[in-house]
């Protein structure tokens, strides 16, 4: 609804209240071009209306004819109305004091980090740092994360985060399979590993032929296993000395991975010092809200010889063109976007934002602060253990860091009931045992309450007093950690962890890092296949509400009513958008959604007695996660050719489907295609695969071009994953978090993922858990709920149409300068377009990399480089960018083309030109010694508009080859920056 100007309204009969109430104002803030701008853009394209454009772009055979069936969310809510509605749901949650533990702990987020990282768009709207020159701030923060992990685990090298502890353990298993015993397929898991980790490891193991054996750790050396997983400390609290066991496992030819509690490692001997080959774990308790299970940043650290087998992102140190230190993503040839089905993992999005928060928690507290927190946690646990013993309880684990398990016998239910009455959650271990874990937030008052609960269940009013217990422990000098396992080595000695402890210094450090980066708060990020749209403030606000942030994933169901209602509503919203029958929100990244979808397809075939179907057809243009996920799901990848127009080659598809008809499991297609086109024959593709016994997996990476206009579940898809961090407004966070829901047809709903260990069993024949928590990254789901609630059906469709309009406008304006490689009928594209720079390289020597780096001088993040076609740029402007910003990008691209023409016609040197030396730092431009044939002004201010709005890249072009040849993935000395 658009209101007329108030001055004009004053001269008329007053409008009714209903006419003055604005419910869809948010849509006007989310969608960039206003009506006048859209009219001008449509006119440039030769269309009278947006509807006419959409009719020309999307095949009529797949058009959605009905309005999105969003039920109570069909009509948009205002920002205030949506927040109020979500607040009603949040208030149905009950925030108890949680001592459940089991890998999830309450933690204090330092407010300086809360406000200046988690709530700061300079951090949360950034993209994965593939363009290092404009990503130095978050790369430094992630390097700090790696240094923190290396120091605390005692291992040589760490990655820059994984999705959660459970999936990190699964990644470690497959890593050890690649490097381990060639004749063994056994992976041994100690029975005191976190239950959710065991479940995810089993899910991952089955498709690739790994046998998981679970038993007492003492049996590991004789299991003939290629790898062994140990928990340190164990789930029930035991702190065990595994030195001798590790030596025995190594002697038997196996390797050891240790799931280690990061806070405990500040006081316990790190795994790397007692022989572990790999360490994994969760960094959640380093200042990240528990959030009903996520998102949190996991870690994985290895011995040096395993570094090239690591999954996930790895930040390394290199030099720039001037020889100064620079950071970049290292060893990318391990990853899915290059290695495809041979990659070390299918991980694309990880948990960068949460890793940055955890690293800044370590920077803020420093080694002394962290150890103080750990010692306080341990002390409170020891005081509770002593008090419970005085009340007649038996402690099942005499050694502990923060977790206690009590033999409670007949008192079990009474103890749990007494705790519930005080709004306290304990962990029911069994009918005769109760466990609990102390955390950073536990206070003296909380300890007194816990002692009172234990006393009540023991039917006594004689509650042990905290001060008396403290004095007794001090006098006895008893230790809960074996002396042999007390940490003696130093950690976090680098200056970054020892100089930013005042809030002033911390604030300025965070600001200095964010100033180095280009994020959506500065300019558009036109990355194809990434959908870098607005992450609105109203969508983000609920993430930090305690009613969402302070709920344990294994809390009793009666305490999570609001969460589950919100999740149910969001699932129904996504069902409406996709045209499928059911959705699971458990996968905590798009890669995990893909993987879950393929496991569901396998389970479906197996239920029909066709478990032998294992061939997955994948078009040559597919995203790298597709073949990597297929390999992880135990499938054989068969590539289907694309024709000259970039579409799936129908004849080759028929041939491959026929050749593999007896074993065909699925095809994975992306729609619109990764070439940015709505393929006209998508229904035929689906029919061919179905006719040969396969299922159709439609990758939802490009769902932003479909919402409200077409639906994969209606044109032949059987299963899809979505990217809520693309289409539905969860921010990219500099490389995560993400959410990758899996959506399925009615015949596949019974196979959606469960999590038996936590009692989450939604599907009768569900696959095993694919994430550590039942609902994955639950605490960021309100972002997508808010987006859909504020947009409503009509405006969601309008957003899709505008995304297509913006892409076609950019393509039209740039086509005279850069050929648009693929298009549909009428020369139109979907929501993105591919600019072909290969002819430019032939005529000028200028590469796609040169253009990408030069864009930084113009204040823009480069589009997606060399995907899906080498030597191209893929541009996706999204619906959120205004015509003004689109024109600014178009102007920059045309100006760069003129710079290239100057090289082509000899006005500029082929080597000494502003593209070859881009990006230009301020230090380079103001240096006394300027040796280039072009002017300083050309380097720094190629357009007059940049004078008022200039972004300076902090480093020159990063040397990728040097960085990989001289791999260094820890914090560099401060002298290197001086």
UniProtKB/Swiss-Prot annotation:
Disulfide bonds: none
Cellular component annotations (GO), alphabetically ordered: cytosol; glycine cleavage complex
N6-(pyridoxal phosphate)lysine: residues bearing it: 726
Enzyme class per UniProt: oxidoreductase
Source superkingdom: Bacteria
Keywords: Oxidoreductase, Pyridoxal phosphate
Entry-linked CDD domains: GDC-P (cd00613)
Swiss-Prot/TrEMBL cofactor(s): pyridoxal 5'-phosphate
Keyword Oxidoreductase applies: yes
Gene Ontology biological process terms in this record: glycine decarboxylation via glycine cleavage system
Gene3D superfamilies, per the entry: Aspartate Aminotransferase, domain 1, Type I PLP-dependent aspartate aminotransferase-like (Major domain)
Catalysis performed (reactions): N(6)-[(R)-lipoyl]-L-lysyl-[glycine-cleavage complex H protein] + glycine + H(+) = N(6)-[(R)-S(8)-aminomethyldihydrolipoyl]-L-lysyl-[glycine-cleavage complex H protein] + CO2
Protein family (similarity comment): Belongs to the GcvP family.
Quaternary structure, from the entry: The glycine cleavage system is composed of four proteins: P, T, L and H.
Chain's role: The glycine cleavage system catalyzes the degradation of glycine. The P protein binds the alpha-amino group of glycine through its pyridoxal phosphate cofactor; CO(2) is released and the remaining methylamine moiety is then transferred to the lipoamide cofactor of the H protein.
Protein name as it appears in the record: Glycine dehydrogenase (decarboxylating)
Organism annotation: Paraburkholderia phytofirmans (strain DSM 17436 / LMG 22146 / PsJN)
